[in-house]
UniProtKB/Swiss-Prot annotation:
Belongs to the anthranilate phosphoribosyltransferase family. Binds 2 magnesium ions per monomer. This is Anthranilate phosphoribosyltransferase. The keyword Amino-acid biosynthesis applies. Gene3D superfamilies: Nucleoside phosphorylase/phosphoribosyltransferase catalytic domain, Transferase, Pyrimidine Nucleoside Phosphorylase, Chain C.
Length: 354
């Protein structure tokens, strides 16, 4: 399916790689249709590695805009295997790329949030900046990733949590793998994953490692009416971190508000990043099991905080951000301590292997 202008007509009309690339090199912001055209060519396999690399480097060098990213997202959705999951859904994810090699905080938080009764639809892949990616760890926990899109949606209804394994839902991304690998630098694709959840969830808690891109990601969410918390640790982590203060972009009703957050405001001590360090998938899965069995410490604190961020995004309440997060942390703690989070994982394992 070709990318289509909402006003009607094929967006490919009158565009070429030299036109788009020269515009970027001249420092001109591109329209959403321009970037959608480029992504459409890439997703079709009709762009060379040189054209893909040139586009990604030129776009990053100029500096991406909300409109440009929105165009890329639109075209990616045109080539994706999408699913429908009824009701209010939330995703907790980080862009990766912070190099910290932490345990899988967003993955553990997703299970805890499911334990509170919220419906979670993750969009995950192999390792980016964690010691192992969400998909790697979930496999070790017993989750079957090799499901059809239809079955993935059914699991969400049966277990209250599911994962869209990126390579199965965005198969056209294979066309960019070589160029991205050869470049070896951050590109726009580092932030597209959280923006292209195949279930098109309406609420997200998203960690963004790149300080340039965090407000852009928030702007894209605002443009499409999502309720989201976008954050970045001031030490560079793509989490709402307990290792430092963070910047938070609160997205509600089409507006973005930027705030500073200090974990000490919700009663948490600052810890060194080493306290959150992970290892391979087997080790990180064991950390998750211990968390769900009630182990306390820095990992639990970080998971409670990021679980709270998702709960606030899904159902914003009254009060300051810190007050809302504190309430969310209490919900998350109850999910762990009551065994509800552990039972959510057990349901998920059973449903994904049924």
């Amino acid at each position: 399916m070709s990318a289509v202008n909402p006003a009607g007509g094929d967006i490919a009309a009158g565009r070429s790689w030299p036109e788009v690339l020269n515009g970027l090199l001249d420092g001109r912001d591109q329209s959403a249709d321009d970037t959608a055209w480029a992504m459409d060519r890439i997703m079709r396999g009709e762009a060379t590695d040189a054209q893909i690399a040139g586009f990604l480097v030129a776009l990053r060098a100029k500096g991406e805009t909300v409109e440009e990213i929105s165009g890329l997202v639109r075209a990616m959705y045109e080539h994706a295997n999408l699913i429908e999951v009824p009701g209010a859904t939330v995703d907790i994810v980080g862009t990766g790329g912070d190099g910290a090699k932490t345990v899988n905080i967003s993955t553990m938080s997703s299970i805890v949030v499911a334990g509170t009764g919220a419906k979670v639809v993750k969009h995950g892949n192999r390792a980016a900046s964690s010691a192992s990616g969400s998909s790697d760890v979930l496999e070790k926990l017993g989750i079957n990733l090799q499901l059809t899109p239809k079955r993935v949606a059914e699991v969400a209804e049966e277990a209250g949590i599911t994962i869209c394994f990126a390579v199965k839902f965005h198969p056209a991304l294979r066309h960019v793998a070589a160029a991205r690998g050869q470049l070896g630098i951050r590109t726009t694709f580092n932030v597209l994953g959280p923006l292209t959840n195949p279930a098109r969830v309406k609420a997200q808690a998203v960690g963004v490692a790149d300080p340039r891109m965090a407000p852009i990601v928030a702007g894209v969410f605002a443009e499409r009416g999502n309720s989201s918390l976008v954050f970045r640790g001031d030490d560079g982590l793509d989490e709402l971190t307990t290792t430092s203060t963070s910047r938070v972009w609160v997205v509600r009703e089409g507006k973005v508000t930027e705030e500073s957050f200090d974990p000490r405001d919700v009663g948490l001590d600052l810890v060194p990043v080493e306290a959150l360090r992970g290892a391979d998938a087997a080790y990180n899965a064991d950390v998750a099991r211990r968390l769900l069995n009630g182990e306390t410490g820095p990992v639990r604190d970080a998971v409670l905080l990021n679980s709270a961020a998702a709960l606030v995004a899904l159902s914003p309440g009254a009060g300051t951000l810190a007050e809302q997060l504190r309430a969310g942390m209490a919900q998350a703690a109850e999910a762990i301590d009551s065994g509800a989070a552990k039972r959510a994982l057990e349901r998920w394992v059973a449903a994904s292997n049924a």
